[in-house]
Amino acid sequence: MKLFTGLILCSLVLGVHSQWMSFFGEAYEGAKDMWRAYSDMREANYKGADKYFHARGNYDAAQRGPGGAWAAKVISDARENIQRFTDPLFKGTTSGQGQEDSRADQAANEWGRSGKDPNHFRPAGLPDKY
């Protein structure tokens, strides 16, 4: 009986362990997807494309699974919260402009995380590379 109980306990622990490893792997790959979208946005430097890159990064990350979706939300929320403080300092935007843009960014983030096509936000003329 003790052997049976021990085997059950070990299998449960190992099962939970593998789920966490999968989650963290998805989160890591999702963070890389977010970084790739950010890097592409900086490289493209295309006016009006930021919402597309927000949606694309979140979409790609969420496709990895729950860990990727979690990473996308954490990174997106952190980015928006940081910008809330840095934009007035470095860009001179007023709080109304910053809040409006932040809400639009968060809508694009959620659009992508929910599995909807990020091309909805793709501006005309953005090179096919992106």
UniProtKB/Swiss-Prot annotation:
Annotated spans, Disordered: 86-130
Domain of life (superkingdom): Eukaryota
Stimuli inducing this protein: Upon cytokine stimulation.
Subcellular localization(s) per the UniProt record: Secreted
Main location: secreted
SMART domains, per the entry: SAA
One Pfam family cited in the UniProt record for this chain: SAA
Gene Ontology biological process terms, A to Z: acute-phase response
Signal peptide: 1-18
One GO term describing the cellular component: high-density lipoprotein particle
List of residues that carry Pyrrolidone carboxylic acid: Q19
Free-text description of this protein's post-translational modifications in UniProt: This protein is the precursor of amyloid protein A, which is formed by the removal of residues from the C-terminal end.
UniProt keywords, alphabetically: Acute phase, Amyloid, HDL, Pyrrolidone carboxylic acid, Secreted, Signal
Tissue: Expressed by the liver; secreted in plasma.
Protein role: Major acute phase reactant. Apolipoprotein of the HDL complex.
Protein family (similarity comment): Belongs to the SAA family.
Disorder named in the UniProt entry: Reactive, secondary amyloidosis is characterized by the extracellular accumulation in various tissues of the SAA protein. These deposits are highly insoluble and resistant to proteolysis; they disrupt tissue structure and compromise function.
Name under which the protein is recorded: Serum amyloid A protein
Provenance organism: Bos taurus (Bovine)
Organism lineage string: Eukaryota, Metazoa, Chordata, Craniata, Vertebrata
